[in-house]
Amino acid sequence: MASNKTTLQKMGKKQNGKSKKVEEAEPEEFVVEKVLDRRVVNGKVEYFLKWKGFTDADNTWEPEENLDCPELIEAFLNSQKAGKEKDGTKRKSLSDSESDDSKSKKKRDAADKPRGFARGLDPERIIGATDSSGELMFLMKWKDSDEADLVLAKEANMKCPQIVIAFYEERLTWHSCPEDEAQ
């Protein structure tokens, strides 16, 4: 039975936990408690690991070739297969694993949150414009806020005409007519 120990070098490089004579100081060994997730980055498989004796905040992504815990990896992969067969759908990655309830709650909270001029903030400038919804809208940056909101152009024209004018002036380009150049 192979150990779940993984050796970390000073530069974060890992090697097999088997004992080797090293002229430098002995690298510290960490024990993998559980494999939590799997991903592929630049064609290399990485596993998200829970380290024994450490908190979840210390969990890390580690390349497969640096690990010496085949039983834990196999157990994780088997649980993934069982989950896929049971669900009949692809398992979500750790970053996407929020429950549907929390997602719908976030959507409700976002819908309840005031947007645009309803936030009571002063407009700073217009970042961009779109008519993808069928009506012209401006992406408005607000003073004293890092957030921007889409606001109806009609509303911006009424509430902050100088900011709308400044937005259009920034984008104006002048072209001279050929007959003007001849004079």
UniProtKB/Swiss-Prot annotation:
Molecular function as annotated in GO: chromatin binding; enzyme binding; histone methyltransferase binding; identical protein binding; methylated histone binding; protein domain specific binding; transcription coregulator binding
GO biological process terms on file: cellular response to dexamethasone stimulus; chromatin remodeling; DNA damage response; heterochromatin formation; negative regulation of DNA-templated transcription; rhythmic process
Modified residues (N6-acetyllysine): K5, K10, K44, K50
Protein location: Nucleus
Modified residues (Phosphoserine): S93, S95, S97, S99, S176
Tree of life domain: Eukaryota
Sequence positions bearing N-acetylalanine: A2
InterPro entries: CBX3_chromo_domain, Chromo-like_dom_sf, Chromo/chromo_shadow_dom, Chromo_dom_subgr, Chromo_domain, Chromo_shadow_dom, Chromodomain_CS, Heterochromatin_chromo-domain
Chain residue numbers at which the record places covalent cross-link Glycyl lysine isopeptide (Lys-Gly) (interchain with G-Cter in SUMO2): K5, K10, K21, K103, K154
Record field: transmembrane: none
Quaternary structure annotation from Swiss-Prot or TrEMBL: Binds directly to CHAF1A. Interacts with histone H3 methylated at 'Lys-9'. Part of the E2F6.com-1 complex in G0 phase composed of E2F6, MGA, MAX, TFDP1, CBX3, BAT8, EUHMTASE1, RING1, RNF2, MBLR, L3MBTL2 and YAF2. Interacts with INCENP, TRIM28/TIF1B, KMT5B, KMT5C and SP100. Interacts with TIF1A. Interacts with MIS12 and DSN1. Can interact directly with CBX5 via the chromoshadow domain. Interacts with POGZ. Interacts with CHAMP1.
Entry protein name: Chromobox protein homolog 3
Species annotation: Homo sapiens
